Regions:
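Hydrophobic alpha-helical transmembrane segments of multi-pass membrane transport proteins
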Residues: 114-157, 185, 242
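Short cytoplasmic-facing helical segments at TM-TM junctions of multi-pass membrane proteins
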Residues: 147-172, 254-257
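Short hydrophobic alpha-helical segments within the ABC transporter permease transmembrane module
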Residues: 118, 122, 162, 166-183, ...
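Selective transmembrane-helix segments that form parts of the transport pathway or gating/packing helices
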Residues: 79, 83, 87, 126, ...
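Short, membrane-interfacial amphipathic segments enriched in basic
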Residues: 24-69, 246-247, 251
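Active-site cofactor/substrate anionic-group-binding motifs, chiefly glycine-
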Residues: 74-130, 134
């Protein structure tokens, strides 16, 4: 009798524990809108904080002091440091473009149009977009990790204590350098891509240098050049401001620095691609 009583008591205790761990469905359902509301408010506040920080950085460009040595150093990091990957990517993409387009033009006996297609594709779209993605992956992450490390080690707080504006000292040189260097890197990418396309066209299609380069240059007009140089300026501004924002708003120590680095690359790349679409629509409307 005692054995049955002890078994019943054990089963009752087990049932009580299961009931205590089970969450009521009503409370889970009622908390979901609250959680979504908190997430939405947090994201809206982050976007607002980003725009305020970017506006402060742009405002600093029109008043002294200017940290020109820091700006030149950042231009070297962003521009010269990115040249190898820009050149390699340009050669590869230019050659692949010729291979893909030539196969279609050969069906109609119009292989001479290869130069036109490669030139327009590189200058209008691929040059600015691919350059922005490469610079974002290399430099937005570097800005976020560098500034995030300074925040974690309290160097930014020490800078404020000494009366130095961190936005003017740290963010403004990076923004200026990136806005100036991304268009130049895009020009390098376009030229190297055309060179890579010519190498492939001359070996596989037997196109002469005069024929290829004449068609490639004549295919472009002023609208294509403006479109190819306007996009990189906007992309450079996005890359620099997002990278600096993610770095200056690091929380959570060294783990936060790692998260900020990843976030900077993802957000800047996605924003560049989204803005690319709307800029293309606007510029095509203006120059067609």
């Amino acid at each position: 009798m005692s054995r049955y009583a002890s078994g019943d008591s054990a089963q009752a205790a087990h049932s009580a524990r299961r009931a205590s761990h089970k969450m009521p469905e009503g409370s889970a359902t009622s908390s979901l809108p609250t959680i979504l509301g908190e997430v939405l408010k947090r994201e809206v506040a982050a976007v607002q904080d980003y725009w305020l920080l970017s506006a402060q950085a742009l405002q600093c460009m029109f008043s002294a002091p200017y940290y020109w040595l820091d700006t030149l150093e950042q231009m070297d990091i962003v521009g010269v440091g990115s040249l190898p990957i820009i050149i390699l990517a340009g050669l590869s993409i230019g050659g692949v473009l010729v291979l893909q387009t030539a196969a279609q033009f050969q069906r109609f006996g119009e292989t001479a149009l290869t130069g036109d297609a490669v030139s327009l594709a590189l200058v209008r779209e691929l040059g600015p977009a691919v350059t922005a993605l490469l610079v974002s992956g290399r430099n937005a992450s570097g800005m976020a990790s560098e500034l995030g490390s300074m925040v974690v080690t309290e160097q930014v707080d020490a800078m404020r204590a000494l009366g130095t504006d961190p936005i003017r000292k740290l963010m403004m040189p990076r923004v200026i350098a990136t806005v100036l260097m991304v268009p130049l890197l895009t020009v390098v990418f376009d030229f190297v891509g055309l060179c890579g396309g010519f190498l492939v066209a001359s070996t596989t299609l037997r196109l002469g240098a005069v024929q290829f380069w004449t068609r490639a240059i004549n295919a472009l007009d002023i609208g294509d050049v403006v479109q190819g140089l306007t996009k990189p300026v906007v992309f450079g501004l996005i890359i620099a401001t997002v990278g600096c924002y993610c770095g200056l708003r690091v929380k959570g120590g060294t783990q936060g620095v790692g998260r900020a680095t990843t976030t900077a690359v993802v957000i800047s790349s996605v924003c560049a691609l989204i803005v690319d679409f709307f800029l293309s629509r606007l510029l095509l409307y203006l120059f067609q």
